[in-house]
């Protein structure tokens, strides 16, 4: 009897081809689209009517069932509210990681068991499998690095990985579009989404105003020596390393070096080299390749989604669930709130949320 697999389908080409490939492999496939967010000011973006229709139409083309699961309240609680809270604290969150943890692989895994399915799948570009030598399920980078999405999947647990299938991990984006074209899928030429799904216009400031009903309080721009340079329009508008759109002119390039929510200040530097640091601390760490970190481990680390891998040594932090990261070469502007993810070769060791950076080169 064929295994029953539930595929998360966003209405895009990746998840559509994932469903196609799994059906071709002999699975009994059902497509599921998550209803996560409604924005009356947006005609497109996360969970738009067009996306739901596209997913349903692809399922019709493939001859498989399609259902919509309403997770709007859970999404608001677990993704949107923490996103807003982090920005108001002057941090730079990655909501996709929270969404994967709480919904795409959290609530989704619970629902498929409830409905009697054997497996779950998504259209992420990554690979997973069982390592008999370690007795653990592993997460691996996609074969084609340009599209690899393992960074946003570091929070996966062993039970989730056991259930998961990632059929796109061996393919390039061009190959996926070619498969969609060849098989007449209606979404074959649909553009990729580029922004945070619930902020399709990319205007974070406007979203925060709508969500909170108020403007973030203004405060001071300060120099590295504490001198007041001018006024900012709220720390939620800035991120570490930012140069453009600061709203202040110093007669030369200036960069956000540090954001202090306690004092409501944004520290600027005119020296880009002062953004670099060699070490950081991360918390809320999730381990995949190991059960726990018991001592120093040499890895390659990535401090943001599009950042290159950098050699580092990780060691247990001072508090439970934390890790200290020492880079071989200084990294530009690691931002508190972002994820740092650790790799050994193709394998994801684990990752966590950056809380602070140390050893600035200034």
Language model region names:
Residues 1-154, 165, 174-175:
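ATP-dependent adenylation/nucleotidyltransferase module used to activate substrates
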Residues 38-39, 121-128, 132-362:
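AMP-forming adenylation/ATP pyrophosphatase catalytic core
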